[in-house]
Amino acid sequence: MKLHEMKPVEGARKERNRVGRGMASGNGKTSGRGHKGQKARSGGGVRLGFEGGQLPLFRRLPKRGFTNINRKDYAIVNLDQLNRFEDGTEITPASLIETGVVSNEKSGIKVLGNGELSKKLTVKAHKFSASAKEAIEGKGGTTEVI
């Protein structure tokens, strides 16, 4: 078999159904839209969430919660991500961005205790979880809140 002899499997390529092209096509006249009514018209159809005049679900349910405008969104760094640095390195938010551990600082850097730390490091960040602080100081490193 050669490349120019290859054909798609029977039934793999279905022909497009052209509607409104005469009664003999099987899809003439109303073009599969039925007779009259809103759905038969161009642009016909109900808007998203419309339930036929019944009070829609999104209006039946009460409003809930709010968006805190003072919310702080921290960039997360896990302990196992700190292993890429050399032993005894001072890690700052700038060095984390430079090495690609985090893409941007957001409201600050928070170090979490997921994974294992195998090096003695000095870590400067905006927040530390208790387990992260314990692990860093357990390896002889230091943590500094900035």
Swiss-Prot record:
One of its GO terms (molecular function) is structural constituent of ribosome. The keyword Lipid metabolism does not apply. GO terms for biological process: translation. Residues 1-18 have a biased composition (Basic and acidic residues). Residues 1-48 are annotated as: Disordered. One of its GO terms (cellular component) is cytosolic large ribosomal subunit. Keywords: Ribonucleoprotein, Ribosomal protein, RNA-binding, rRNA-binding. PANTHER family: 50S RIBOSOMAL PROTEIN L15, LARGE RIBOSOMAL SUBUNIT PROTEIN UL15M. HAMAP family: Ribosomal_uL15. Binds to the 23S rRNA. Belongs to the universal ribosomal protein uL15 family. Part of the 50S ribosomal subunit. This is Large ribosomal subunit protein uL15. The gene is rplO.
